[in-house]
């Protein structure tokens, strides 16, 4: 699919030793474009808890799995193919070793994501045995740090440091592109940072500034793109507005910004929610399938939409037939407003149905419990986001869904930050965020929230049984509802 969607998949990341950014437009911008692609995940809440070119931009097409986004790279000499989860919420690239406990089992657990065999690469070099990543539910991987050659988006990075999982409970490798201060060896052992992927692109001259932009496109699209070192003005509406990233425990380590307002709109009424939880610190995390908001806000949204909420799993359900209705949730960040249509919030739940026979869809907003709120893919699909690590800023605009237009601008060095973006006047910064370290996915408190069942989850039934593996988990939950266990 990558060649089909190459026009949709350019992400600019240009890094130049922590300096500010200026607008550059030329025939061959310094960007690297990477395609990202979608892949189906049967239970996004459980999955979230598990994972919490001289052309100086580098772009990559992303696979859109409805709930997760993947990119294809090769590692080593000769290249070994890997499919990695794109994750802005962590900072290490890691993959499973071919002889790991997981990949060596009889279930072919690593067939889809691929694995890495150090002994088969002539450019492999051992670094340390400090790789030890864990996620909110206790899963993770333990192994070594190493360096090797990475081929990504038509560009080559030499001596890139990455993690190899020899003992692993996660079959999915990860392409972490967050702050270096969130790397495993920093958080686990207090060691110095190393140049992770975006930083290495700067150091090796592929891009000019440590920044990239992300365009996931809509739920129906198979692909999106990440553009290292630049922005693609054809992929968003209006203008980019720039906000400061908030410090976590006194340092810049995660993409946390201040959410100042949430509103509900339908054909019959408009409601702006008031809550003591606002303004709230929210983490922008492409590795989270769903969006996790403060409980009081979620309760209001669920009440207005009559969501059927099942507390033990932390999942809300709505009739799939609501897709296409004029219902929106709007998020405000001091000044910028990002509007998410109901179509982008209804995820396939297989054959799960309400008792009246209507198909049930997973609702893409769930309660955060006691943890920091997370704006995951059910938000990010509706936003074009520039992650400016060099200047500790986020630039954001409403996405231009299914755009075939490309206008790539290089992020250079200078005082003006992101190309064509304007600074938000007097942005809210009085929010407190607690860091969770390297993770992909849901807040740990999501399953024990006090949000009530606005509509009885017992209204759900199993519908017509299917044997498809991707629907098995949800079908079992549905049966559990029916039996009243």
Curated annotation (Swiss-Prot):
What topology does it adopt in the membrane?
Lipid-anchor; GPI-anchor
Q: Which residues are glycosylated?
A: 72, 99, 107, 111, 132, 328, 337, 402
Checking InterPro entries in the record gives:
Aspartic_peptidase_A1, Aspartic_peptidase_AS, PEPTIDASE_A1, Peptidase_aspartic_dom_sf, SAP-like
Superkingdom assignment: Eukaryota
Query: Propeptide residues, per UniProt?
Result: 462-485
Give the positions of lipid attachment, kind GPI-anchor amidated serine.
Answer: 461
Carries keyword Lipoprotein? yes
Give the E.C. number(s).
3.4.23.-
What is the residue range of the signal peptide feature?
A: 1-20
List the active-site residues. Answer: 87, 285
Keyword field: Aspartyl protease, Cell membrane, Glycoprotein, GPI-anchor, Hydrolase, Lipoprotein, Membrane, Protease, Signal, Virulence, Zymogen
Output one GO MF annotation.
aspartic-type endopeptidase activity
What are its GO biological-process terms? fungal-type cell wall organization; proteolysis
**Peptidase A1 domain sequence ranges:** 69-397
Taken from the UniProt entry, a GO cellular component term is: plasma membrane
- Pfam families for the chain: Asp
PROSITE patterns (UniProt xref): ASP_PROTEASE, PEPTIDASE_A1
Q: Which protein family is named in the record?
A: Belongs to the peptidase A1 family.
| Protein role | Probable GPI-anchored aspartic-type endopeptidase which contributes to virulence.
Protein name per Swiss-Prot or TrEMBL: Probable aspartic-type endopeptidase opsB
Its source organism is Aspergillus fumigatus (strain ATCC MYA-4609 / CBS 101355 / FGSC A1100 / Af293) (Neosartorya fumigata)
